[in-house]
Amino acid sequence: MGKKLVSILTAGALLTTLLTGCLQTDKTPQSAPVQPEVKQDEKQDAKQNAPQMVIKVSNGVAEKHPAVVALKEKFKAIVEEKTNGRYVVEVYHSNQLGDDVKATEALRAGTLEACVTSTAPLVGFTKELAIFDIPFLFPDEKTADAILDGPIGEKMSKLMPSKGLVNLAWWENGFRHLTNSAKEVRVPEDLKGLKIRTMENAFHLAAWRAMGSNPTPMSWSEVFTALQQHAVDGQENPVPNFYTARIHEVNKYITTTGHIYSPFMFLFSKKIFDTIPKEDQDIIIAAAREAGLYERQLNREATDEYLSEIEKEGGTVIRLTPEQKKPFQELTASVWDQVADKVGKDLVEELKSEIAKAAK
């Protein structure tokens, strides 16, 4: 009996030991997965391959506009290729980063790298840019190119650094034309009573009042809806601007007044530009200028193409001859003096002289 009891106790102890071992095995945590070792040279390569800077470029026009196309197809491509990817360009359109004024303010503050903007909204920053708000200043694109790429354009560019800006290149917004939903406009008298959306610019407002309309300043992002709801009757812009924004869907009548030629400035934040090595600055400037020539070409080709498309879609295009534009020109002649009072008569006289040279 004693031996039997000892055997039972021994067997029980052995069973307990086995069970305890099994339980402990179940509780043992699994080993963590082995992480692949990142070699020091791989870390260094990743660091070297990361972009040195992301250049965000803002613009207010639509995605299919020639300016946006040129930014993507030329400027972005050239900068990224020439810098071996050290600089990456991101293009924003349709006022995604704010309108021209807000984008320019961001450049001055150093919170945005670049923007392509019309000169008209910038007169509050640099009054001399008002020379480009003189109605019927340039007879054609050739004259505009000569002025922007010559001494006047250089003089305007030299004013920018003191405002916290660097003008990389002159691009083209284009000749501004009238659209409206009410009637055909062939003579100034046809403008009477029409409510026309303009930019927030004193000289543009003065010109449209002089021609007999009721100008109403409004942000570009609000224009389509305002036209659709008949809050305003019409607007004025270069053809690529209003075609790519589908303005002709709510404004059937287009008159090629060509009352103002609007340049684009490709501006860069001086605060940010000053941190970029000289070699890379040169690449960025050269890319902006090459892309600018491409943009001008695209813009001019698009103007003719889009007017034809508008007619095919049922719109009415009134193409004014130089002779037919004269009554509009005569009514707005007083704006020359208004601009001279703001920027100085010497600058306006220099501008006239350069235009005369370009016409020869």
Give the residues covered by each predicted segment.
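N-terminal secretory/targeting leader peptides
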Residues: L23-V34, A46-T143, I152, M160-K360
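Bacterial N-terminal signal peptides that target proteins for export
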Residues: M1-L9
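Repetitive helical segments and hydrophobic/amphipathic motifs
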Residues: G12-A13
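C-terminal motif of bacterial Sec signal peptides marking the signal peptidase cleavage site
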Residues: L18-G21
